[in-house]
């Protein structure tokens, strides 16, 4: 791993974006647009996916675009799961009219649930893109990334299947559920281990529209 880190082509701008996103979390936040949401998800998690793609010595740069999307999808899951907890800290990442103060009252359940559903649906788009990039990674890395992704995605899917009961607190995927998801994923993980590296070029699989709101941020598809 240390050797991989030494040979990875890190861009200091990526680190700066990550630090900027983390520092921004120290104060109150009231997002009002989808662009703000996606740029934040990129800053605190998409950059992590990008860095990991480089550390794993991805076979093609195309992998970076998908890695950003997977990191962003996981952050969207975090946001959906923690909407009440964040509101209690004065933070509102979901772009909607109710403020963090109004969210804390739990009186606008239907409106908040509707916006929460939109964020979960958005995360599914980015999960799909993220998982499409797995075959650009070295074979032995693919199952770990896949399992991590499906376990995280299960949180937002469970939140949705339970009726978007955000006001009841964090949705948790328990040990039995996680074990079942892992067992069920094993055939696909085996396929990932033997699947050849994708030979598509940089414009082949990734949808550039997914990075439209990221406005030339480091590593994005522009």
Q: What does each of the following model-derived ranges do?
A:
Residues 1-73, 80, 84-222:
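Catalytic cores of Mg2+-dependent Asp-rich isoprenoid enzymes
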